[in-house]
Amino acid sequence: MARNDKNDKNEQTDGLVERLVTVDRVAKVVKGGRIFSFTALTVVGDGNGRVGFGRGKAREVPAAIQKALEAAKRNMITVELNDATLYHPIKARHGASKVYMQPASEGTGVIAGGAMRAVLEVAGVKDVLTKCYGSTNTANVVRATFNGLRDMSTPEKMAAKRGKSVDEILG
Protein backbone atom coordinates (compact mmCIF):
# COMPACT_ATOMS: atom_id res chain seq x y z
CA MET A 1 0.00 0.00 0.00
CA ALA A 2 1.35 3.37 -0.97
CA ARG A 3 1.02 6.23 1.48
CA ASN A 4 1.57 9.81 0.50
CA ASP A 5 1.61 12.26 3.39
CA LYS A 6 1.33 15.84 2.20
CA ASN A 7 1.27 17.92 5.37
CA ASP A 8 2.78 20.92 3.64
CA LYS A 9 -0.22 21.50 1.37
CA ASN A 10 -2.16 24.48 2.71
CA GLU A 11 -4.81 26.31 0.76
CA GLN A 12 -6.94 29.27 1.78
CA THR A 13 -10.51 29.57 0.58
CA ASP A 14 -13.27 31.68 2.12
CA GLY A 15 -11.15 32.28 5.22
CA LEU A 16 -10.57 28.59 5.92
CA VAL A 17 -7.17 26.92 6.00
CA GLU A 18 -7.33 23.53 4.29
CA ARG A 19 -4.76 20.87 5.16
CA LEU A 20 -4.39 17.55 3.38
CA VAL A 21 -3.41 15.00 6.03
CA THR A 22 -3.08 11.86 3.95
CA VAL A 23 -3.99 10.18 0.67
CA ASP A 24 -4.12 6.38 0.51
CA ARG A 25 -4.64 4.00 -2.39
CA VAL A 26 -7.15 1.28 -1.56
CA ALA A 27 -8.27 -1.74 -3.55
CA LYS A 28 -11.56 -3.53 -3.96
CA VAL A 29 -11.00 -7.14 -4.97
CA VAL A 30 -13.52 -8.40 -7.52
CA LYS A 31 -13.75 -11.50 -9.68
CA GLY A 32 -11.76 -9.90 -12.49
CA GLY A 33 -8.98 -8.51 -10.28
CA ARG A 34 -8.59 -5.34 -8.25
CA ILE A 35 -10.33 -1.99 -8.59
CA PHE A 36 -8.14 0.77 -7.20
CA SER A 37 -9.45 3.98 -5.68
CA PHE A 38 -8.10 6.69 -3.40
CA THR A 39 -9.13 7.94 0.03
CA ALA A 40 -8.20 11.38 1.30
CA LEU A 41 -8.27 12.77 4.82
CA THR A 42 -8.38 16.56 5.21
CA VAL A 43 -8.82 19.06 8.01
CA VAL A 44 -10.07 22.62 7.66
CA GLY A 45 -10.15 25.47 10.13
CA ASP A 46 -10.27 29.23 10.40
CA GLY A 47 -7.28 29.47 12.75
CA ASN A 48 -9.55 30.96 15.39
CA GLY A 49 -11.22 27.98 17.05
CA ARG A 50 -13.30 26.47 14.25
CA VAL A 51 -12.09 23.12 12.93
CA GLY A 52 -13.45 20.16 10.98
CA PHE A 53 -12.20 16.98 9.35
CA GLY A 54 -13.48 14.94 6.43
CA ARG A 55 -12.79 11.82 4.43
CA GLY A 56 -13.39 11.37 0.75
CA LYS A 57 -13.08 8.42 -1.59
CA ALA A 58 -12.98 8.42 -5.39
CA ARG A 59 -11.29 6.78 -8.37
CA GLU A 60 -9.04 9.82 -8.84
CA VAL A 61 -6.99 11.70 -6.22
CA PRO A 62 -8.33 15.23 -6.91
CA ALA A 63 -11.93 14.04 -6.66
CA ALA A 64 -11.19 12.27 -3.36
CA ILE A 65 -9.56 15.42 -1.96
CA GLN A 66 -12.50 17.57 -3.06
CA LYS A 67 -15.00 15.21 -1.40
CA ALA A 68 -12.93 15.19 1.78
CA LEU A 69 -12.80 19.01 1.88
CA GLU A 70 -16.57 19.27 1.42
CA ALA A 71 -17.10 16.73 4.22
CA ALA A 72 -14.70 18.64 6.48
CA LYS A 73 -16.57 21.92 5.92
CA ARG A 74 -19.86 20.21 6.83
CA ASN A 75 -18.31 18.65 9.95
CA MET A 76 -16.98 21.80 11.65
CA ILE A 77 -17.10 22.49 15.38
CA THR A 78 -16.11 25.49 17.49
CA VAL A 79 -13.34 25.06 20.05
CA GLU A 80 -12.92 27.65 22.78
CA LEU A 81 -9.23 28.43 23.24
CA ASN A 82 -7.34 30.11 26.07
CA ASP A 83 -5.50 32.66 23.90
CA ALA A 84 -3.43 30.32 21.73
CA THR A 85 -3.45 27.22 23.92
CA LEU A 86 -5.83 24.84 25.70
CA TYR A 87 -7.64 25.45 28.98
CA HIS A 88 -6.60 22.19 30.64
CA PRO A 89 -4.87 18.87 29.87
CA ILE A 90 -6.99 16.58 27.70
CA LYS A 91 -7.04 12.82 27.27
CA ALA A 92 -9.12 11.47 24.41
CA ARG A 93 -9.41 8.33 22.37
CA HIS A 94 -10.95 6.89 19.27
CA GLY A 95 -10.64 3.18 18.73
CA ALA A 96 -7.15 2.10 19.80
CA SER A 97 -5.71 5.60 19.35
CA LYS A 98 -5.21 7.60 22.51
CA VAL A 99 -4.04 11.21 22.55
CA TYR A 100 -2.88 13.49 25.35
CA MET A 101 -2.78 17.26 24.91
CA GLN A 102 -1.44 19.69 27.49
CA PRO A 103 -1.47 23.50 27.49
CA ALA A 104 1.95 25.08 27.06
CA SER A 105 3.44 28.48 27.82
CA GLU A 106 3.66 31.12 25.12
CA GLY A 107 6.45 30.52 22.62
CA THR A 108 6.49 26.73 23.01
CA GLY A 109 4.90 26.05 19.62
CA VAL A 110 2.92 23.03 18.51
CA ILE A 111 4.79 19.94 19.69
CA ALA A 112 2.79 17.24 17.91
CA GLY A 113 2.99 14.51 15.30
CA GLY A 114 1.74 14.90 11.75
CA ALA A 115 -1.97 14.15 12.05
CA MET A 116 -2.42 15.89 15.42
CA ARG A 117 -0.34 18.86 14.27
CA ALA A 118 -2.61 19.42 11.27
CA VAL A 119 -5.77 19.53 13.42
CA LEU A 120 -4.25 21.78 16.08
CA GLU A 121 -2.70 24.25 13.62
CA VAL A 122 -5.87 24.80 11.58
CA ALA A 123 -7.84 25.17 14.84
CA GLY A 124 -5.58 28.05 15.83
CA VAL A 125 -3.70 26.41 18.70
CA LYS A 126 -0.20 27.91 18.82
CA ASP A 127 1.27 26.45 22.04
CA VAL A 128 0.60 22.84 23.05
CA LEU A 129 2.42 19.68 24.10
CA THR A 130 0.98 16.40 22.80
CA LYS A 131 1.58 12.68 22.83
CA CYS A 132 -0.10 9.90 20.89
CA TYR A 133 -0.38 6.41 22.41
CA GLY A 134 -1.60 3.11 21.01
CA SER A 135 -2.54 3.01 17.36
CA THR A 136 -1.13 5.80 15.24
CA ASN A 137 -3.61 5.23 12.42
CA THR A 138 -3.95 8.68 10.88
CA ALA A 139 -7.75 8.72 10.70
CA ASN A 140 -8.16 7.56 14.30
CA VAL A 141 -5.59 10.04 15.63
CA VAL A 142 -7.42 12.89 13.87
CA ARG A 143 -10.76 11.72 15.31
CA ALA A 144 -9.30 11.34 18.81
CA THR A 145 -7.80 14.85 18.64
CA PHE A 146 -11.10 16.20 17.36
CA ASN A 147 -12.99 14.47 20.21
CA GLY A 148 -10.61 15.91 22.80
CA LEU A 149 -10.94 19.45 21.48
CA ARG A 150 -14.73 19.12 21.30
CA ASP A 151 -14.98 17.89 24.91
CA MET A 152 -12.67 20.58 26.35
CA SER A 153 -14.55 22.91 28.67
CA THR A 154 -13.81 26.46 29.78
CA PRO A 155 -13.48 27.45 33.46
CA GLU A 156 -16.77 29.36 33.08
CA LYS A 157 -18.60 26.20 31.95
CA MET A 158 -17.05 24.14 34.76
CA ALA A 159 -17.99 26.77 37.36
CA ALA A 160 -21.58 26.93 36.12
CA LYS A 161 -21.82 23.13 36.09
CA ARG A 162 -20.52 22.84 39.67
CA GLY A 163 -22.35 25.88 41.00
CA LYS A 164 -19.13 27.64 42.00
CA SER A 165 -17.37 30.82 40.98
CA VAL A 166 -14.60 30.87 38.38
CA ASP A 167 -12.10 31.93 41.07
CA GLU A 168 -12.90 28.80 43.11
CA ILE A 169 -12.38 26.60 40.04
CA LEU A 170 -9.06 28.19 39.10
CA GLY A 171 -7.93 28.11 42.73
UniProtKB/Swiss-Prot annotation:
Residue intervals of the S5 DRBM domain: 16-79
One cellular component (GO) term of this entry: small ribosomal subunit
Keyword Ribonucleoprotein among UniProt keywords: yes
UniProt keyword annotations, A-Z: Ribonucleoprotein, Ribosomal protein, RNA-binding, rRNA-binding
The protein's assembly and partners: Part of the 30S ribosomal subunit. Contacts proteins S4 and S8.
HAMAP family linked: Ribosomal_uS5_B
Function field: With S4 and S12 plays an important role in translational accuracy.
Family affiliation: Belongs to the universal ribosomal protein uS5 family.
Protein name: Small ribosomal subunit protein uS5
Species whose genome carries this gene: Psychrobacter arcticus (strain DSM 17307 / VKM B-2377 / 273-4)
